[in-house]
Amino acid sequence: MKTGDTVADFELPDQTGTPRRLSVLLSDGPVVLFFYPAAMTPGCTKEACHFRDLAKEFAEVRASRVGISTDPVRKQAKFAEVRRFDYPLLSDAQGTVAAQFGVKRGLLGKLMPVKRTTFVIDTDRKVLDVISSEFSMDAHADKALATLRAIRSG
């Protein structure tokens, strides 16, 4: 999946087990969908907490933040509870959506099932930006915000 591509609609359970559909999430504005390798690990915690801490900034650009990993619902629930996340964490337990986005790993799949990648998706399901960085955790939220601000001011 790259900038300009159209994302196929999908539905996955969030950390409460509630089914969440992309098209419904997009009804409130753009979605910043960030794939992370594993809940409760240091890098993923840093990344997800940075998204949490920028809640006001994302609200200003009318964008929703949505985390996604291959972790089961119960692990997502614990992650969300411990870190007090105010956004959905989707459970892509089979890796179907990760494969659709081209971020599912092959050989490294056991340790890190998905590539740390963020997609900024507009309300028409078009990809506005793709942010890839395995090591710069803050870059994902920061660059997504920069993209959304540029579009709003443009």
Curated annotation (Swiss-Prot):
Its EC number is 1.11.1.24. InterPro entries: AhpC/TSA, Peroxiredoxin_AhpC-typ, Peroxiredoxin_BCP/PrxQ, Thioredoxin-like_sf, Thioredoxin_domain. Gene3D superfamilies: Glutaredoxin. It catalyses: a hydroperoxide + [thioredoxin]-dithiol = an alcohol + [thioredoxin]-disulfide + H2O. GO terms for molecular function: thioredoxin peroxidase activity. Residues 1-153 form the Thioredoxin domain. Disulfide bonds join C44-C49. It is an enzyme of class 1 (oxidoreductase). This is Putative peroxiredoxin Rv1608c. The gene is bcpB.
